[in-house]
Amino acid sequence: MAFQLKVKNKKSNHGLSENKPNKFRSIFTKVKVVAKNVIYVKGWSKSLVKNKTINFLSKKNRNNIEFSFSNYIVKTVREPDPIVIKSKELRYKSFFKEDKNQTKDSDRFDDYCDHLVVIDKSISDNYVVGSYRLLLKPKNKERISFYSESEFNIDKLFKNQQLSLMEAGRSCVHKDYRDGRIIKLLWRGLASYIYINKVDLIFGCASFPSSNSQLFAKELSYLNLNHRPPKNFSCHPIERLRARYKRYKESEYNDKEIFRSLPPLIKAYIRAGAWIGEGAVCDYTFNTTDVLVVLSSKNIIKKYSNLSI
């Protein structure tokens, strides 16, 4: 591996051992498949931000990552790097139907995000085959706007100013590379980014593949009963967007069967110690039912400290 980090053997102020970057990254080898419900936040509702001041983090506060594996390069890039355009083009092909008048997925937030990309250098130096969009808020910094706020109330995540927050969004993999290699490289890159930027809390929206939330009533009931975050991290849908579905009791379904039926990345995040916020949102534009995932990096270290890459 070409991405070893050399750090002193010490404890951070959150009790995380800083000499275990490999162990931290190792959990992401668990993901084997890419699904349509990858964790990303899609369109930012213009109606929700029309009269809202949007604050962003200075790019000077973030650290880059870059490493190689076989024919691939994994790194973070930012505007105006032309590779960001390649990332946007891949996102558009992954999320939307083809439109000859549009070739890339882009919005106002791209300028302020880090774009984690996987490049197949055997094709070219800018052939992006995987991408993630990351928005970071370091501890003790002014609150910034996140995409999840278009669907969920996440105010409680900001209560503790000692926590560094990161939203992960716009995850996608080229259709010809969906054999597990690229998603694992993306997640390893994500883990490295989390480590060097001292991220404490990761969150983002995850989707079920239909806006008919009743189709997933048992799954949503299971998540609500078994994987809700603690009160200090509790989040809930914006009320007018809240999905309406039958609430099942635990005695009315089989836990193991329901867990197996969850979308692959929701299962992967739960295995990594993630919580799922209360309720869900129906996104009729993208025909999905969305939930909010909240993940503590301390939980990741604790749960997977004995694994190696």
Q: Where are these predicted regions, by residue range?
A:
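A structural microfeature
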Residues: 129-130, 278
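Long, continuous compositionally biased terminal/linker segments
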Residues: 292-309
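Intrinsically disordered, low-structural-confidence terminal and linker regions
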Residues: 1-33
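Short amphipathic alpha-helix that is part of the acyltransferase structural core
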Residues: 60-129, 136
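A short helix-loop-beta-strand connector motif used in the catalytic cores of GNAT acetyltransferases and
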Residues: 108-117, 142, 286-291
